[in-house]
Swiss-Prot record:
It comes from Exiguobacterium sp. (strain ATCC BAA-1283 / AT1b). Plays an essential role in the initiation and regulation of chromosomal replication. ATP-DnaA binds to the origin of replication (oriC) to initiate formation of the DNA replication initiation complex once per cell cycle. Binds the DnaA box (a 9 base pair repeat at the origin) and separates the double-stranded (ds)DNA. Forms a right-handed helical filament on oriC DNA; dsDNA binds to the exterior of the filament while single-stranded (ss)DNA is stabiized in the filament's interior. It comes from the Bacteria. Residues 1-83 are annotated as: Domain I, interacts with DnaA modulators. ATP binds at residues 166, 168-170. Signal peptide: none annotated. Keywords: ATP-binding, Cytoplasm, DNA replication, DNA-binding, Lipid-binding, Nucleotide-binding. Residues 122-338 are annotated as: Domain III, AAA+ region. Residues 339-459 are annotated as: Domain IV, binds dsDNA. This is Chromosomal replication initiator protein DnaA. It is found in: Cytoplasm.
Length: 459
């Protein structure tokens, strides 16, 4: 028999002792949490503030649920709450909730909101037009989304929004759904990811319920389908979505689609689907500029009731310049760090909080062409000569060096390297690599040459 507090203490102990997350992260996000109660198959856990609750749900939920299952041999849902709300969930004196055996199989009703996305009509309450920060990179996408929401199936149908991860595509889709619901409370809205659409379709085939599946998705007013690029390669699902699209479009129902790339760049997407995606309006969202990033941080701080100086916001905005989710996450981390170390939020605290999560600039990926150009410049020969069939000593030796570097500094296969050097056989590449490797053991001049070339390639 274990109660919620004991279970949660065990969970934290395992995570800390086995270093399943860095110590700094554990101290910042997990150490201050506490198990409050067991409600059926739901474990209620408190955290000191709402932004910590949000961070735990986004970053740690999977790890925590796996650890809970490992300890209890039960699949328990974790529901995070603010510490100030803990009294609402704490069991009354003598309540069995406080000492439920974790192997309890009897289901008990738990009045908690569902977190599952994809249910027809279910939308995220935070994703509305009023909370969307408009900037140069998303202004047109926002205007198009608002136009669609104001006049479904009359403005742009379909509306296709594309852009990188965390830039606001999903926010706009949910905002459209909320706006339509506000104007027409009886409207049937479906928000679904392409992955969930695929899974439901597969399940309907397995259970002989394809008719029910089709009725569900073809009798709605607005279809919001996220990450359509994941339909690539799924021929049967594409076939089903093609007919769903046609049915809705013919009935003058609104379709909104999001993707990480435009239709023409989605591989193995059927041409008939690609052409339909291009029937309406295609708009993109690009990473926010500095002013927009600061505005996003300011709006989040206001929503959370946080007093953050412009100096700190500027610092954070300068560190994260591509992804809105990471930007908001950075603010959350700074606030949590300041709270836990008991210091005011200033640029120094922000720098300390973010020092180990700043994106490290990836080294440029070296390709064979880079090596050919650098070697050619070093030996004063043209790349075309390096790749020619000529076997003069002035060409053969630099060519062998270039092949050696291609083998050492790229992930290309031997046949690929040979192909890039004038269609030579892979055995030629092996010979070149062995020859240069042998010379490097004792030839100081060769060692210096290779070092110089590697340095040039790295720069």
């Amino acid at each position: 028999m274990k109660n919620a507090r004991e279970i949660w203490r065990n969970v934290l102990s395992v995570i800390e002792e086995e270093e399943r997350t860095p110590k700094a992260s554990f101290d910042m996000w997990l150490k201050s949490t506490e198990g409050i109660s067991l409600m059926g198959t739901t474990l209620v856990v408190s955290a000191p503030a709402s932004f910590i609750v949000t961070w735990l749900e986004r970053q740690y939920l999977s790890l925590l649920q796996d650890t809970v299952e490992e300890i209890t041999n039960n699949k328990l849902e974790i529901h995070f709450i603010e510490e100030s709300q803990a009294h609402k969930y704490a069991p009354a004196d003598g309540s069995s909730n406080e000492s439920i055996a974790v192997t309890e199989t009897k289901e008990q009703p738990v009045l908690l909101p569902s977190k599952e996305e994809g249910d027809l009509g279910q939308l995220n309450d935070k994703y509305i037009f009023e909370t969307f920060v408009i900037g140069s990179g998303n202004r047109f996408a926002h205007a198009a989304s608002l136009a669609v929401a104001e006049a479904p199936a009359r403005a742009y149908n379909p509306l296709f929004i594309y852009g990188g991860v965390g830039l606001g595509k999903t926010h706009l889709m949910h905002a459209i759904g909320h706006y339509v619901k506000g104007q027409k409370p009886g409207a049937r809205i479906a928000y679904v990811s392409s992955e969930k659409f695929t899974n439901e379709f597969i399940n309907s085939i397995r259970d002989n319920k394809t008719g029910e599946f089709r009725n569900r998705y073809r009798n709605i007013d607005v279809l919001l389908i996220d990450d359509i690029q994941f339909l690539a390669g799924k021929e049967q699902t594409q076939e089903e979505f093609f007919h769903t699209f046609n049915a809705l479009h013919n009935d003058q129902k609104q379709i909104v689609i999001s993707s990480d790339r435009p239709p023409k760049e989605i591989p193995t997407l059927e041409d008939r689907l690609r052409s339909r995606f291009e029937w309406g309006l295609i708009t993109d969202i690009t990473p926010p500029d500095l002013e927009t990033r600061i505005a996003i941080l300011r709006k989040k701080a206001t929503a959370e009731g946080l007093d953050i100086s412009n100096e700190v916001m500027l610092y954070i905005a300068n560190q994260i310049d591509t992804n809105i989710r990471e930007l908001e996450g950075a603010l959350t981390r700074v606030v949590a760090y300041a709270k836990l170390v008991g210091r005011p939020i200033d640029p120094d605290v922000a720098a300390e909080a973010l020092h180990n999560i700043m994106p490290v600039q990836e080294a440029k990926k070296i390709v064979i062409r880079d090596i050919q150009e650098v070697v050619g410049q070093h030996f004063n020969i043209q790349v075309e000569e390096l790749n020619s069939k000529k076997r003069t000593k002035t060409l053969a030796f630099p060519r062998q060096i270039a092949m050696y570097l291609s083998r050492e500094m790229t992930e290309s296969s031997l046949p690929k390297i040979g192909e890039e050097f004038g269609g030579r056989d892979h055995t030629t590449v092996i010979h070149a690599h062995e020859k240069i490797s042998t010379l490097l053991k004792n030839d100081v001049e060769m060692q210096e040459t290779i070092q110089t070339l590697k340095k040039a390639l790295s720069n």
